[in-house]
């Protein structure tokens, strides 16, 4: 079934009509030219990412230039699996992430999942009780007290080494570090980026595809993540892929909220009565701060400083029509969203954070 789905998906992308009209602001979709523009920006800002070509000319798509068929970053660490121990809270109730711009009646589709958000406070308190230590009259903290049954017997020091039952290999609670190669491609059918993941247990030992699902948030793993052949490689290399069917709607929501947050900030700046108040407002990063430190690059804001320090940022008339996130910054925001799908993979490692 996966082979059939992968083949149909590849041919659907290659045969779909190519859009040359930008609908970035209205639909969250981008054209192939905008994908290249956003890829160039990602590579420029974060050199761990690079453009790559298909393994052979036959694997190339015509709507992207040779040498820029997809983006790749290699060796991204993944330290922990998404089980009940992940982040201390995984395995418990997930929650939908929203922001203050969403109303009380907002649909779950307006946000995205964050794993392990609903752990009961009483559970945490019960765990803390186990970490009680003693304090002497001088205020010095003592060592953790072992349970009575855990106090060692002095005779144990003479145990025969050969009689000790050791933990079998592979049963250690310390989880081995996995690494991932991440690939961003362009889906011509959905007109959005698409992420593929290829995992490794060691530099020379690929991670079996079904084990990659251990690093995907459960709700996505069950609905939108599939195992497919990577269309740009010969030989049928199987990877996990986040299906792009909802990428455009999620990106549109994020872009709209970033614009709304920027408008609120500008309105506050207009009403500011002092330089100190304006500086405080400027330091508050709303959703337009999704693009890391690129906000200053996108707004082209000018600042005036009088001799007495009474003037602050001046908003030019044409800046009212500017947006919080440009189309060339699209992939940076896209990766912030993807990080919620695979929270165990250190996406910030790829972005020099």
Swiss-Prot record:
Q: How does it assemble?
A: Monomer. Interacts with atg8 through an intermediate thioester bond through the C-terminal Gly of atg8. Also interacts with the 40 amino acid C-terminal region of the E1-like atg7 enzyme. Also interacts with the atg12-atg5 conjugate.
Location(s), subcellular: Cytoplasm
Q: What is this protein called?
A: Autophagy-related protein 3
Q: What family is it from?
A: Belongs to the ATG3 family.
Physiological role: E2 conjugating enzyme required for the cytoplasm to vacuole transport (Cvt) and autophagy. Required for selective autophagic degradation of the nucleus (nucleophagy) as well as for mitophagy which contributes to regulate mitochondrial quantity and quality by eliminating the mitochondria to a basal level to fulfill cellular energy requirements and preventing excess ROS production. Responsible for the E2-like covalent binding of phosphatidylethanolamine to the C-terminal Gly of atg8.
According to the lineage, what is the superkingdom? Eukaryota
List every stretch annotated Flexible region. Answer: 85-167
- A GO cellular-component term linked to this record: cytosol
Biased composition regions of type Acidic residues, renumbered to the chain: 144-156
Q: Which GO terms describe its biological process?
A: autophagosome assembly; autophagy of mitochondrion; glycophagy; piecemeal microautophagy of the nucleus; protein targeting to membrane; protein transport
> Which catalytic residues are annotated?
245 (glycyl thioester intermediate)
Query: Could you tell me which residues belong to the region Handle region?
Result: 249-329
List where the protein spans the membrane: none
Record's comment describing the protein's domains: The N-terminal region is involved in phosphatidylethanolamine-binding and is required for atg8-PE conjugation. The flexible region (FR) is required for atg7-binding.
Q: Which organism is it from?
A: Neosartorya fischeri (strain ATCC 1020 / DSM 3700 / CBS 544.65 / FGSC A1164 / JCM 1740 / NRRL 181 / WB 181)
Parts forming coiled coils? none
Where the protein is mainly located, per its record? cytoplasm
Q: Name one Pfam family in it.
A: Autophagy_act_C
Listed GO MF terms = Atg8-family ligase activity
Classification via InterPro entries: Atg3/Atg10
| UniProt keywords, alphabetically | Autophagy, Cytoplasm, Protein transport, Transport, Ubl conjugation pathway
Q: What are the boundaries of the region Disordered?
A: 135-156
Q: What is the lineage of its organism?
A: Eukaryota, Fungi, Dikarya, Ascomycota, Pezizomycotina
């Amino acid at each position: 079934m996966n082979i059939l789905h992968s083949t149909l998906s590849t041919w659907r992308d290659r045969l779909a009509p190519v859009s040359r009209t930008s609908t970035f602001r209205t639909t969250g979709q981008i054209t192939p030219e905008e994908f290249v523009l956003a890829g160039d920006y990602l590579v420029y800002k974060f050199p761990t990412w690079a453009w790559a070509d298909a393994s052979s000319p036959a694997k190339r798509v015509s709507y992207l230039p040779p040498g820029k068929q997809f983006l790749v970053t290699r060796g991204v660490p993944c330290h922990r699996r998404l089980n009940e121990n992940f982040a201390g809270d995984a395995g418990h109730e997930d929650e939908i992430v929203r922001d203050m711009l969403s109303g009380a009646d907002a649909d779950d589709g307006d946000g995205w999942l964050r794993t392990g958000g609903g752990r009961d406070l009483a559970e945490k308190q019960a765990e803390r009780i186990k970490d009680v230590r003693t304090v002497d009259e001088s205020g010095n903290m003592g060592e953790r007290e072992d349970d009575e049954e855990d106090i060692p017997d002095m005779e144990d020091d003479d145990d025969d080494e050969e009689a000790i039952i050791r933990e079998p290999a592979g049963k250690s609670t310390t989880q081995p570090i996995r690494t991932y190669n991440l690939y961003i491609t362009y889906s011509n059918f959905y007109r959005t980026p698409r992420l593929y993941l290829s995992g490794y247990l060691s530099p020379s030992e690929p991670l079996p595809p079904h084990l990659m699902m251990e690093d995907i948030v459960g709700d996505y793993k069950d609905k939108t993540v599939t195992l497919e052949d990577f269309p740009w490689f010969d030989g049928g290399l199987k990877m996990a892929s986040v299906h792009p069917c909802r990428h455009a709607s999620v990106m549109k929501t994020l872009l709209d909220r970033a614009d709304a947050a920027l408008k609120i900030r500008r309105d506050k700046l207009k009403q500011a009565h002092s330089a100190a108040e304006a500086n405080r407002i400027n330091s508050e990063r709303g959703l337009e701060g999704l693009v890391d430190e690129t906000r200053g690059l996108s707004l082209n804001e000018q600042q005036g400083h009088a001799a007495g320090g009474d003037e602050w940022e001046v908003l030019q008339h044409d800046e009212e029509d500017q947006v919080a996130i440009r189309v060339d910054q699209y992939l940076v925001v896209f990766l912030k969203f993807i990080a919620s799908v695979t929270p165990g993979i250190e996406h910030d490692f790829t972005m020099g954070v």
